Amino acid sequence: MHGESPIKRRESRKIWVGNVPVGGDAPIAVQSMTNTDTNDVAATVAQIQRLVDAGVDIVRVSVPDMDAAEAFGKIKQLVSVPLVADIHFDYKIALRVAELGVDCLRINPGNIGREDRVRAVVDAARDRGIPIRIGVNAGSLEKDLQKKYGEPTPAALVESALRHVEHLDRLDFQDFKVSVKASDVFMAVEAYRLLAKQIVQPLHLGITEAGGLRSGTVKSAVGLGMLLAEGIGDTIRISLAADPVEEVKVGYDILKSLHLRSRGINFIACPSCSRQNFDVVKTMNELEGRLEDLLVPLDVAVIGCVVNGPGEAKEAHVGLTGGTPNLIYIDGKPAQKLTNDNLVDELEKLIRQKAAEKVEADAALIVRG
């Protein structure tokens, strides 16, 4: 039953992506990106709905051409979550999705083209209250910066970002957020640290092209964990070569581990050993699958023996300690004994009961407040 995070977040300007606040005192928003063909409206909408069910706050959609822009407009009408249009090279695509109701434009002013084209995009965004994300990536730095630095470096990423920030400053546009992504953890972390000291706009965190489900999760957790623990970051996207729904799950798990955001069950479970009095791994796998729909923030401890079990269980909303018989704790106090027969069924029932009680108690607090 952990309290608030001890992390002091960096002060930043608040912007709005649709109805989702980003920056300032807003919760850190979790983003993902579709990997369907945007022209396949049905498939893209279906994937977005799966992301919404997983708890995503903002979804980015690639819009590579005008056909995709028209498809984007149809998609926008069929979903409720804020959508970011990912646009490169052709400024007319940005103008079109602005007309169609996009919630945020992800652009790199450096590849949009001449000053008048950037101004046209910014004017369209300003007129419709649409924020912009300046997205700098180590894999697509400007040629002059590649020549100056020889290779991507944190300083090169920040110089590119500040160049684009100054560009928007000249156009008197402040409704934007910035990212400086790299696939190398140290490069990305240092770039974000440097940039955080120089601008007040919200920062979109990510380790780009992090890898597959396992390797990408580890790299993202290490890199984003370092930054978030320092108070840097206002929205995150976990880039995985995997089902985008996994990006949302990993994002929430990272935030939960730092007590920055709570959604669903926070499991505390031992890796198990020969002391276990029930099959911890099997129990955990079953519980995670069964309770995936539960959104109420709860700490649940599943410990196989009495070495650490009682101590962990006493700190959880619901705790299971292996023994003969096993002992259930509710809100830190011994509540009942369970045998291994129907253990998962009984534990699931108790967790759902505790979740319902918590919802009722929270609602009562709101009414009294």
Curated annotation (Swiss-Prot):
Cofactor(s), names only, from the UniProt record: [4Fe-4S] cluster
UniProt organism field: Pseudomonas putida (strain GB-1)
Transmembrane stretches, start-end: none
Function field: Converts 2C-methyl-D-erythritol 2,4-cyclodiphosphate (ME-2,4cPP) into 1-hydroxy-2-methyl-2-(E)-butenyl 4-diphosphate.
Binding site for [4Fe-4S] cluster: C270, C273, C305, E312
Cofactor annotation remark: Binds 1 [4Fe-4S] cluster.
GO biological process, one term: isopentenyl diphosphate biosynthetic process, methylerythritol 4-phosphate pathway
EC number from the UniProt entry: 1.17.7.3
Catalytically driven reaction(s): (2E)-4-hydroxy-3-methylbut-2-enyl diphosphate + oxidized [flavodoxin] + H2O + 2 H(+) = 2-C-methyl-D-erythritol 2,4-cyclic diphosphate + reduced [flavodoxin]
Protein name: 4-hydroxy-3-methylbut-2-en-1-yl diphosphate synthase (flavodoxin)
Pathway annotation: Isoprenoid biosynthesis; isopentenyl diphosphate biosynthesis via DXP pathway; isopentenyl diphosphate from 1-deoxy-D-xylulose 5-phosphate: step 5/6
HAMAP family: IspG (MF_00159)
Statement: the UniProt record of this protein carries the keyword Iron: yes
Keywords assigned by UniProt, alphabetized: 4Fe-4S, Iron, Iron-sulfur, Isoprene biosynthesis, Metal-binding, Oxidoreductase
